């Protein structure tokens, strides 16, 4: 019988991140300046940690992880296990082999810690006095608050208002880590004041929260802005997930036919899949990749592939990506970490070239959360609402394998736990 839990020894924790940019089939379209206004690239160079900006444009395939940072990863519980979902397989009566990567086991309950610790490590090296960021579902804000507490740095978080207001327990956790948490849009910023003047009850969006974080960093000396998704260096830090997973499949002498991840801006999907995609591009393996999304924000599924801003106010450079429009209005969902207008430029290019498939699910989230309940009752673990989209897609693929008799090996990334999201499940499932 195949192992149910595949644990990589600590000594085998990856020593470098993987940067896919040199292996892409086409050059990645570079960021562009808009036709009017100040230089956005110059602005970013003032508010983002310099080493992170250097990594953003790196042409190195492998970027060494500093030893002190590897120790922080180990302290945070890496390497993380890969599990075989045998009870779920049995319930579905599928010939497919189902696996899930456990990023829910981090101290804050999500994969976001992987880049939070990296960005903060470099911030301290450069003498940064504080960090500021945005957060949607709250996982990124929690991760940065956690990392900042270890580094003894102040951390300011602008949190999408409609989620901030109902996730009281996660807000408390952020504050216990020392985070200074503000609902977004907020009167603290010019961006927020303008939006609230037009609509005092605006629910907020990740694009708005990013704009507020950038403005805060610009106006507060010594502060750096940290972004939790989309950018190249963020995805690179997250490749530790996929690099571990490659070695874990080697341990059980099995290789995945399909990798699945939920998709908002792309950090968890990219971190899980890019090391595998790189091997596909280099002719070393065959595998397919599926991004699972909400119809509330189907950026990489239904967006336009064009240049657009990454934030609501247009403070960032223009990025070539699949976008719904940087100022688009998206309906609130409980999987709010997926509610973002744009997709990572790297993943957008790969999608445009046909290397990534997509699937979308209804805004009401009923089918997605029913999959969560099935997973909880078979595997015993509660995933985050965002991760539930990956689980829903994995179950759907397993059911298709039952119909066709195909013995696929399918793996999904469970990007976080849902212990602080119970209200969302209660509301949708009428519990």
Mark where each language-model region is.
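Alpha-helix C-terminal capping segments
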Residues: 118-128, 142-154, 175-176, 273-283, ...
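A short, small-residue-rich loop immediately preceding and capping a beta-strand
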Residues: 123-162, 255-269, 289, 386, ...
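Active-site/ligand-binding loops adjacent to catalytic centers
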Residues: 65, 79, 195-233, 252-253, ...
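Claisen-condensing/thiolase-fold acyl-transfer catalytic domains that form or cleave C-C bonds
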Residues: 263-271, 365-431
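Active-site nucleophile and cofactor-binding loops and adjacent substrate-binding regions
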Residues: 102-113, 131-140, 231-234, 260-265, ...
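Positively charged, low-complexity intrinsically disordered leader regions
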Residues: 2-128
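Active-site-proximal loop->helix
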Residues: 132, 140-203, 299-309, 421-430
């Amino acid at each position: 019988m195949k192992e149910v839990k595949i644990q990589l020894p600590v000594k085998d924790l990856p020593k470098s991140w993987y940067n896919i940019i040199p292996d892409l089939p086409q050059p990645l379209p570079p960021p562009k300046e808009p036709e009017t206004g100040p230089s956005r690239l110059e602005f970013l160079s003032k508010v983002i940690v310099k080493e992170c900006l250097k990594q953003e444009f790196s042409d190195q395939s492998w970027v060494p992880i500093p030893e002190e940072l590897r120790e922080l990863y180990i302290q945070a519980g890496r390497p993380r296990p890969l599990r075989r979902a045998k009870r779920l397989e049995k319930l579905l009566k599928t010939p497919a082999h189902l696996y899930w990567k456990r990023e829910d086991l981090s101290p804050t309950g999500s994969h976001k810690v992987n880049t939070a610790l990296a960005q903060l490590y470099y911030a301290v090296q450069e003498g940064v006095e504080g960090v500021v960021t945005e957060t949607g579902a709250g996982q990124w804000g929690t991760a940065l608050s956690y990392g900042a507490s270890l580094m003894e740095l102040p951390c300011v978080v602008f949190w999408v208002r409609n989620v901030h207001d109902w996730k009281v327990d996660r807000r408390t956790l952020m504050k216990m880590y020392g985070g200074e948490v503000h609902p977004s849009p907020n009167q603290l910023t010019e961006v927020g004041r303008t939006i609230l003047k037009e609509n005092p009850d605006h629910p907020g969006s990740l694009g708005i929260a990013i704009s507020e974080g950038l403005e805060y960093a610009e106006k507060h000396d010594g502060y750096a802005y940290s972004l939790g998704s989309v950018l190249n260096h963020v995805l690179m830090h997250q490749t530790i997930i996929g690099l571990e997973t490659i070695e874990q499949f080697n341990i059980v002498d099995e290789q995945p036919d399909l990798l699945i991840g939920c998709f908002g801006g792309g950090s968890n999907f990219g971190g899980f899949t890019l090391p595998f995609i790189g091997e596909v591009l280099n002719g070393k393996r065959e595998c397919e990749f599926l991004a699972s999304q909400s119809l509330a924000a189907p950026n990489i599924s239904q967006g336009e592939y064009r240049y657009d801003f990454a934030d609501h106010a247009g403070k960032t450079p223009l990025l070539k990506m699949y976008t719904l429009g940087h100022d688009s209005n998206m309906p609130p969902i409980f999987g709010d970490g997926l509610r973002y207008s744009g997709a990572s430029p790297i993943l957008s290019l790969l999608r445009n070239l046909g290397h990534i498939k997509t699937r979308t699910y209804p805004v009401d989230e009923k089918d997605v959360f029913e999959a969560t309940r099935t997973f909880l009752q078979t595997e015993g673990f509660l995933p985050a609402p965002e991760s539930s989209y990956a689980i829903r897609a994995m179950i759907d693929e397993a059911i298709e394998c039952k119909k066709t008799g195909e013995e696929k090996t399918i793996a999904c990334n469970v990007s976080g736990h849902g212990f602080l999201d119970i209200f969302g499940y209660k509301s949708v499932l009428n519990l």
